[in-house]
Amino acid sequence: MVETVYTLFLYLILVKEEDFNQTFFFCSDALPELVRCKLPHHHCFKLPKRRWHRWLFRIWLYYTAPLRFPFIKQSHIYGSDNYLFSSGIARSYDLILVEDGLSNYSLIQVNSLLYKPRRILMGQIAAEGCGGVSPTVKKIMLTGLLPVPALIQDKTEIFSVINKWNRLSSSYRTRILSLFDCLAEELEEISSYQDILFTQPMVEDGLITLEDELNLYRTLLAGCNQSKLLIKVHPRDTLDYSKF
């Protein structure tokens, strides 16, 4: 289950090339079409915009997924648990959670009064909450961007992106770069920068205020040579960083 190129990339470096060939990807139209069309097998959900439509979608998917995708119960499930379709696809099956950004390090409490209706209508993950707190999440793969919340430490494994990437075969690395349309010239240009800031939609997700987000980035980039800084903006991040 993927919605961002970030999580997709992490999944690809965590598995072998033969596993990639046999993976069925559940995604939404948030994942760029140029990437989706290169996936070996996938289903793209067109997610509703209105709030009550989104609730109906989650209920509908939870009850129809076993009929539409019967192979799920026999599969190893990877991905994030914070997508609109996560609970309906993962259901009560074991899930290996793959980092999707800073939200994995900031657990959001779910209203306990809604546990039973959510559990009945939308599944275990919807009832328990996101970030790996559900008992169906057996393992959490994180890169260590921030300290891991105590609640999920016991089932969290920290891995190095660089080490995982270097262990891949050259042919598989080339295939991954092709999937994301990464050209050799672009990689050479990126390598000329000293620092890269990958932004996150923290304001859009209601995690912090705009002022706090900017202060966080300023702290992270303190002492950084801005002429050698590359900013990679998250697809859902609406901030124009050229103004700051």
Language-model regions: role of each:
Residues 199, 224-244:
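Catalytic donor nucleotide-activated moiety binding site of glycosyltransferases and closely related
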Residues 19-20, 72-73, 186-197, 201, ...:
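A short, charged/proline- and glycine-enriched loop
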Residues 15-16, 67-69, 181-191, 221:
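Short boundary motifs at domain starts and secondary-structure transition points
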Residues 114-196:
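A nucleotide-sugar donor-handling region in carbohydrate enzymes
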Residues 1-134:
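Active-site and donor-binding regions of nucleotide-sugar-utilizing enzymes
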Residues 32-33, 37, 202-205, 236-239:
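Short, catalytically relevant binding-site loops at active-site mouths
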Residues 210-218:
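Signature of uroporphyrinogen-III synthase
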Residues 199-211:
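Surface-exposed cleft-lining segments at the edges of enzyme active sites
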